[in-house]
């Protein structure tokens, strides 16, 4: 189960804010590069170009940012996802290219100092992908897993990606849901203890219920177990994170309010405890992070 603690005041010193590019047209996505001790921030900029910047946190808690780099000069969607590939020491970013029929694409980024450079753009889905593309890293397989859906059919798909140098290639496509992926988000978390990928989404064929499914990586392929309902009501704003100490997955979502629930993975299945209400009302997107 999960419980909600009372809010607390941040006791550590807070540094001064850093100037950030003003052309952000949507949400930002940040990913931490462990090897370089840097944070890369992605966003949709002017003319809907995909942009990013490398941020450095100093010992006195001040933040500095490098020069803006475009990873896609066409037209991206505001929902950009990224993860850190620990074995390769690279950043993998996935996005929807609205300037190319909504295809789902990926690039490998290399951080050097206060800048980042990218390898060749790779299309991993040449169909009308929705805004649900997401990505996680599997430390056991040393692969990334991407998920996405078709904007017209609402089919949900997944692929395993292999990073080599500054390039990425993908294995065969697996379907985790047929004609039922609703909303604008697919939550993803990697359970390092079970070596499993957990997806959470809104099942349009089942009254919009919050649903989760467990994926197993084998080589360059992924397969899925039986889906499980974690909320018998319409959900949205899905997000998830893995707690390495408790060895559990925490899902957050919006229903009548903002809620959270803990999942336990066993084999190719997942079970859930009782949910907790974080906020009784409100709309938007829930977000989770492990401290």
Residue ranges of model-derived segments:
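Extracellular, repeat-based ectodomains that mediate carbohydrate processing or recognition
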Residues: 1-291
């Amino acid at each position: 189960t999960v419980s909600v603690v009372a809010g607390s005041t941040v006791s550590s010193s807070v540094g001064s804010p850093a100037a950030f590019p003003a052309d952000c047209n949507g949400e930002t996505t940040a990913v931490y590069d462990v090897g370089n001790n840097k944070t890369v921030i992605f966003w949709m900029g002017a003319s809907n170009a995909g942009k990013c910047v490398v941020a450095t946190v100093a010992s006195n808690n001040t933040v500095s940012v490098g020069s803006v780099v475009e990873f896609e000069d066409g037209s991206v969607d505001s929902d950009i996802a990224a993860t850190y590939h620990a074995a390769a020491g690279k950043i993998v970013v996935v996005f929807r290219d609205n300037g190319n029929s909504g295809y789902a694409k990926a690039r490998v980024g290399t951080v050097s100092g206060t800048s980042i450079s990218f390898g060749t753009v790779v299309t991993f889905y040449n169909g009308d992908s929705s805004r649900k593309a997401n990505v996680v890293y599997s430390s056991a397989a040393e692969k990334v897993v991407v998920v996405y859906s078709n904007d017209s059919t609402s089919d949900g798909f997944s692929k395993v990606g292999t990073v080599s140098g500054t390039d990425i290639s993908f294995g065969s496509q697996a379907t985790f849901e047929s004609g039922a992926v609703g909303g604008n988000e697919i939550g993803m978390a990697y359970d390092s203890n079970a070596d499993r990928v957990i997806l959470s989404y809104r099942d349009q064929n089942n009254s919009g219920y919050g649903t989760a499914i467990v994926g197993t990586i084998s080589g360059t392929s992924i397969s899925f177990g039986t889906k499980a309902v974690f909320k018998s009501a319409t959900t949205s704003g899905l997000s998830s994170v893995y707690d390495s100490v408790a060895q559990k997955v925490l899902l957050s979502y919006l229903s009548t309010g903002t809620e959270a629930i803990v999942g336990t993975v066993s084999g190719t299945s997942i079970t859930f405890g009782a949910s907790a209400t974080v906020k009784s009302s409100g709309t938007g997107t829930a977000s989770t992070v492990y401290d």
